[in-house]
């Protein structure tokens, strides 16, 4: 299957794929969910939950980075961080892979479409815990949402298998993000509807357009199995399949893509020779220092202690999560497991951990912890480790964007 065919497989299914850039109302302060009471969602129907969204800013009359990258005029734009010649069309036009701009949610009790092992992207801001099923994101790549009062873009790039969440607030604006139809290093390139600046999904930096050089703030995302997230957040919210689009949710439009012997689509750089292109790694970056933890090492050890920019971390792995990029049905995908990265400190006391029965036990108190860093039994029950931003991705992508990355070795 060609790269264009793969990308188009995730595109039209009843819609024409044309960009839809609606003028929004005046910018204002973010609207917290549920009219300021995010702990008590408003239920509109059994299982369905109503959440309020931030007010997005108006479209601005500025030169378009999106147009420039597609062969248009570049007059009036700052020097791009990435030569437009390095951007590749994935096939679909802008928003041909349609983002979800008006997300609907269901309660945990209302979910009947996820298997225990299906991957969900977990976000928790101020106790507002949400799960975004990869079976939905694989078809849309971006959800413009508001979580814990923060306007958030929850993003997923299938070609890099990378999940990242970004604050949509930029210079007093609240942005709305779409898919540009372009790729850089085989990774999703987003654009904002307010200025049509292009942004790298992988590092959150504006690369072509009026906001070139601006960086988005990130929030931690963990890709975990539905069963683990459900048990940890019985009162949480789950992105609904009621997206307004006709897609075959639960199926994988990129079957076989994650084969270790395959090559990434539309990646024209040289792959760092330390691993093959499609080797899975956990990527961590703190203050410019980067570390890749190979998944094979995590499979062997379960827990890998790490230090990045002087910060001690603990990196975890448990089995039980299906690959979304393997079989035609996501639920049938190979068990690649799931990861978590945390600061291993509680009340100033450093902890070390040992894998145990699908969770972890700290060696200091004997408390049991789940994959989301919550103590579920023992003296520290109810405590939460500080999560650290990380990305589960392929080596070709991590090493392309972080060429100076170190690699974790066996303990």
Stretch-by-stretch model annotation:
Residues 17-411:
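Mid-to-C-terminal functional-domain signal that highlights helix-capping/loop sites
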Residues 13:
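Short, conserved catalytic or interaction motifs in soluble domains
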Residues 7-10:
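C-terminal motif of bacterial Sec signal peptides marking the signal peptidase cleavage site
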């Amino acid at each position: 299957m060609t790269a264009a065919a793969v990308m188009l497989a995730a595109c039209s299914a009843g819609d024409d794929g044309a960009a839809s850039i609606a003028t929004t109302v005046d910018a204002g302060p973010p609207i917290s969910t549920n009219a300021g009471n995010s702990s008590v969602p408003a239920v509109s129907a059994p299982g369905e939950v109503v959440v309020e969204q931030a007010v997005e800013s108006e479209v601005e009359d500025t030169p378009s980075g999106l147009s420039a990258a597609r062969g248009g005029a570049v007059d009036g734009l700052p020097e791009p961080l990435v030569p437009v010649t390095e951007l590749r069309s994935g096939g679909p036009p802008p928003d041909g892979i349609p983002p979800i701009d008006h997300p609907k949610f269901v309660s945990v009790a209302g979910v009947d479409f996820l298997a225990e092992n299906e991957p969900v992207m977990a976000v928790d801001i101020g106790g507002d815990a949400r799960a975004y099923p990869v079976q939905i994101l694989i078809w849309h790549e971006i959800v413009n949402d508001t979580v814990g009062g923060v306007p958030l873009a929850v993003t997923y790039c299938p070609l890099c298998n990378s999940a990242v969440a970004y604050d949509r607030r930029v210079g007093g604006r609240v942005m709305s993000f779409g898919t540009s139809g372009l790729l850089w290093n085989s990774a999703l390139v987003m654009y904002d509807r307010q200025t049509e600046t292009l942004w790298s999904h992988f590092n959150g930096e504006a690369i072509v357009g009026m906001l070139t050089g601006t960086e988005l703030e990130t929030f931690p995302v963990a890709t975990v199995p539905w069963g683990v997230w459900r048990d940890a957040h019985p009162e949480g919210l789950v992105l609904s399949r009621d997206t307004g689009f006709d897609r075959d949710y639960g199926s994988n439009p990129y079957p076989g893509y994650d084969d270790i012997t395959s090559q990434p689509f539309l990646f024209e750089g040289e792959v760092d020779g330390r691993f093959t292109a499609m080797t899975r790694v956990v990527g961590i970056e703190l203050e410019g220092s980067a570390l890749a933890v190979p998944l094979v090492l995590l499979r062997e050890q379960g827990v890998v202690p790490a230090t990045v920019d002087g910060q001690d971390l603990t990196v975890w792995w448990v089995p039980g999560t299906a690959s979304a990029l393997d079989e035609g049905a996501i639920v049938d995908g190979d068990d690649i497991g799931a990861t978590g990265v945390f600061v291993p400190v509680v009340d100033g006391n450093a902890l070390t951990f040992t894998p145990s029965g699908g969770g972890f036990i700290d060696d200091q108190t004997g408390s049991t912890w789940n994959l989301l860093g919550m103590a579920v039994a023992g003296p520290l029950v109810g405590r939460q480790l500080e999560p650290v931003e990380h990305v589960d991705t392929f080596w070709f992508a991590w090493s392309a964007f972080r060429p100076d990355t170190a690699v974790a070795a066996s303990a």
